[in-house]
Amino acid sequence: MAGIDEIDEIIVRELRKNSRITLTELGKKVGLTASAVKNRIEKLEKLGVIKGYSAVVDTSFFGEFLTAIIEVELVDPEAPDLAKVLQPILRMRNISDVYKKSGEFQLAIRGTFRDVDSLNSFLKDLRKVYLKNLARRMRVSIVLENFKEAGVILK
């Protein structure tokens, strides 16, 4: 990408590992002053390379003990209003990721739920309220163990 060099790549890689790293620590890793690192980070943000910062959270503290990956086979993967239809789902606190993808199931949704009943309730709403006639079928996988999330190794 134009305007991005090896030092920028290292900065991004380090921020992905630990977005709370200090500018001074980051500067030591790349051989720059904290001020120079700050300028580079601001440039990366303006270019859209860095889109935001987030925390990896243990959702069990919020009573959500079950993580599920829901794949949806769409009737029409190129439906022009798909992004608009997905807006309520994208705003749900417990839905962390939504992807349009290739393959047999063109939509993937990752979310956390209190229990199987709350997951089933979401699946019912997903089919009947949010996706109505857009979903042909769904496939659900329950996450048994999480080893890495948002670039952070958990175990």
Swiss-Prot record:
InterPro entries: AsnC-type_HTH_dom (IPR000485), Dimeric_a/b-barrel (IPR011008), Tscrpt_reg_AsnC-like (IPR019888), Tscrpt_reg_AsnC/Lrp_C (IPR019887), Tscrpt_reg_HTH_AsnC-type_CS (IPR019885), WH-like_DNA-bd_sf (IPR036388), WH_DNA-bd_sf (IPR036390). It holds the Pfam family AsnC_trans_reg. Keywords: DNA-binding, Transcription, Transcription regulation. Residues 4-65 form the HTH asnC-type domain. GO terms for cellular component: cytosol. Residues 23-42 bind DNA. The keyword Transmembrane does not apply. GO terms for molecular function: sequence-specific DNA binding. GO terms for biological process: response to amino acid. PANTHER family: LEUCINE-RESPONSIVE REGULATORY PROTEIN, TRANSCRIPTIONAL REGULATOR, ASNC FAMILY. This is Uncharacterized HTH-type transcriptional regulator PYRAB00550. It comes from Pyrococcus abyssi (strain GE5 / Orsay).
